[in-house]
A protein has these predicted regions:
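Juxtamembrane "helix exit" motif at the C-terminal ends of alpha-helical transmembrane segments
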Residues: 63-93, 104, 108
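Alpha-helical transmembrane segments of multi-pass membrane proteins
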Residues: 1-12, 67-71, 100-112
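Short amphipathic alpha-helical segments
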Residues: 89-97, 101, 105, 109, ...
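Polar-ligand-bearing catalytic/cofactor-coordination segments
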Residues: 1, 5-59, 113-118, 122-190
Length: 190
């Protein structure tokens, strides 16, 4: 866990990663606006928080904590079948790998439960580390980052409303001369 946190702290000093973290914060603000059923525009997004209970960062933290608990419960009962340390390590890896699926599933369900019951004290305690960890992986975005996140969300909402199936392969990359041109193409533009 300390290695993961240290890695995030280290890369967060890089200017490009700081910008990525600003987009991450903008994504959260956009989702907060959408969940509040407010207009998807910068003025409504700006005051929202950059922390979100269903963040992937929180999910990673929940999955790590869940894996620690599961492995602490399961691995002591695994007999040592090989005398060689290397062979035993491989054997433990073979046992741990299939456990990753239920660990990920349990972490996902814990996060869903947290999102459905955000006012419950136990749930708040469960998600508190993830919410704190988001302080490392999000930064306060500027208006340009908010515009991009809101445009992406508007396009996503529009696509879901259209239920038009898969995106055509020839339309997978579109180039626009400016952000205003992108915004003008979006049906839900503010």
């Amino acid at each position: 866990m300390a290695l993961f946190v240290g890695y995030i702290l280290l890369i967060s000093r890089m200017p490009d990663i700081r910008r990525v973290f600003m987009y991450h914060g903008a994504e959260h603000k956009s989702v907060h606006v959408w969940e509040a059923d407010e207009p998807l525009d910068v003025d409504h997004a700006r005051p929202k928080t950059t922390a979100h209970p269903r963040c992937g960062t929180s999910l990673i933290l929940i999955a790590l904590a869940t894996s620690f608990v599961v492995f602490a419960v399961v691995l002591p009962f695994v007999p040592r079948v090989f005398e060689s340390d290397a062979a035993h390590a491989v054997f433990l890896l073979v046992i741990k790998l299939p456990l990753l699926l239920p660990i990920a599933g349990l972490a996902y369900e814990l996060q869903r439960m947290a999102a459905k019951n955000p006012d419950n004290g136990l749930v708040r305690a469960l998600i508190a580390p993830g919410m704190l960890f988001q302080r490392l992986t999000t930064r306060e975005p500027g208006d340009p980052e908010l515009e991009v996140a809101l445009a992406a969300l508007r396009k996503t909402v529009w696509r879901e409303q259209q239920d038009s199936g898969p995106v055509k392969s020839d339309a997978s990359v579109e180039v626009f001369p400016s952000f205003a041109a992108v915004d003008a193409q979006l049906p839900l533009a503010a």
